[in-house]
Amino acid sequence: MTAYKDRSKEELLQEKSQLEAQYKEFQGKGLKLDMSRGKPSAAQLDLSMGMMDVLDSFTDLKCEAGIDCRNYGVMDGIPEAKRLLGELIEVPADNIIIYGNSSLNVMFDVVSHAFTHGIMGMTPWHKLDKVKFLCPVPGYDRHFAITEYFGVEMINVPMTPQGPDMDLVEKLVSEDEAIKGIWCVPKYSNPQGYTYSDETVRRFAALKPAAKDFRIFWDNAYNVHHLYDEPQDVILELLSECEKAGNPDM
């Protein structure tokens, strides 16, 4: 197939006419396609229909801590929910916060708070001359949209089948105090479906960033959403690895 740049004007006009005809044909079909990403199908939604039958007007709606769950609840979530999520992601319930209805919502709020109030008493990012983030590419565009929204300088880091290029990550974060974070989808990273290796996770946990308020944004969105029934990828739990490496808050 001849590249467009090598075609004559007549050939390009002919191609344009053919594509317009195809476009009109598609329009004529009256298709109404929902191309939303990550939106469950009706069959997937049906899996949770049993939840609709669990409660009725006679149900005791107080949790084990005595909190009336019909009300606003508590800031970090009820104990039962924290324990359930802790078991799913292999993290102690004390380290779980039940918050928001999506990880993207939570990450946006964390970045926003870092800009307005800083992280753990450190300088708010809006007072800094420059804020930078490492962005493994290809990666998730909605992550990048957050940093773009806040005017953060984004630095590309190439992806490998084992995860981001850790030689480059280690070099960049150790040399530049303006680098405040990195976006990560550690399991089945879009679009290649790569899962971070054990070595990659341990190297993340052992990072020595120049910025004391550097944070790893570990968006393990596909923790229980495997691509196939078999095999299923397993990754090391980052928080415990960070604690082992002496970086419990990173």
Predicted region positions:
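N-terminal "arm"/small-domain region of PLP-dependent enzymes with the aminotransferase-like
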Residues: T2-G77, G86-E87
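Glycine-centered flexible beta-alpha turn that most often forms the glycine-rich phosphate-binding loop
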Residues: D219
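A generic secondary-structure signal marking the coil-to-beta-strand transition
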Residues: K29-L33, A178, D249-M250
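Conserved core of the PLP fold type I
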Residues: I67-K212, N223-G246
